[in-house]
Amino acid sequence: MRVVLGFIKACHPLPTIAVSLVISAFGWSLGWTGLPLLAVFITILVGQLSVGWSNDAHDANLDARIGRITKPTVAQEVSARALWIAAFTALLAAIVLSLAIAGWLGGSFHIFAILMAWLYNIRLSRTALSWLPYALAFGVMPAFLSFGLNDEPPTLWSVAVFAIIGVSAHLANAIPDAETDAAAGVGGLVIYLGTRRSVILCWLLLALGSGILVVVSFATNLWLALLVSVTFVLAEVLGSRLRHPKAMFYALIAVVVIDVAALVIVTAIN
């Protein structure tokens, strides 16, 4: 049981489930239903498991060196070797599943996304290019689902919004740990920019993503356009003025969640 819990913790369960649900919800809005939609969810989940396990396996030595006792490899709940084996097994399974449910063209985009996430884990997570795999991996998700469903290309605006959401989520997730990461010698775009400039960049990206959603939804659903606009302004004001140390983080995440929901709704309406 201890080993099973170690594998669960090492897969980064919350982000893994969140990403799988978000992309599956977008797939539903495009027209995926029933068993094919379930297959999409399982495929994405398996891919995310490979990403989470490879991340903890690769960082095992660093986590041990800086004493991250909450990490399962440091707590000796599971070994780095076992995580590598599980990660490669999940990667191979995700490749097969991607091609099976979305064909060679659609499936190749999901495989590319998974490989970008692995590239982040192994090489780019501690560099100023840490944002790039997020932009590319999230940006190709509409192509995976659209080509896989009916061999049609995705809308350009959905590609742009997905890429923006990916980079914004990366920044918002890294900002709260910027000081501890810097002290541990861990790099990344947030470390290179500093917390203040990273927050500004994240808000600018979310403003762009929200703006695209407002423009796209304005013609078909005025209330949705207003909701996205008001939520963005309210979150920015509260995040800037509240004194809670994580107020800005929660505000940024709130906008990301609203943008994701709006993306699904706009796609379903259109």
Residue positions per predicted region:
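Intramembrane alpha-helical segments
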Residues: 2-9, 72-154, 235-242
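Short, aromatic-rich membrane-interface segments at the entry and exit
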Residues: 34-41, 103-110, 127-132, 152-158, ...
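Small-residue-rich segments of transmembrane alpha-helices in multi-pass membrane proteins
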Residues: 19-26, 132-149, 191-195, 250-267
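Acidic (Asp/Glu-rich) catalytic motifs at the cytosolic membrane interface
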Residues: 43-74, 165-189, 195
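Multi-pass membrane catalytic core of lipid/isoprenoid biosynthesis enzymes
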Residues: 60-106, 110, 186-219
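Extended hydrophobic alpha-helices typical of membrane-associated regions
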Residues: 2-5, 197, 215, 221-270
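Functional transmembrane core segments of multi-pass inner-membrane proteins
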Residues: 29-36, 134-182, 196-200, 205-208
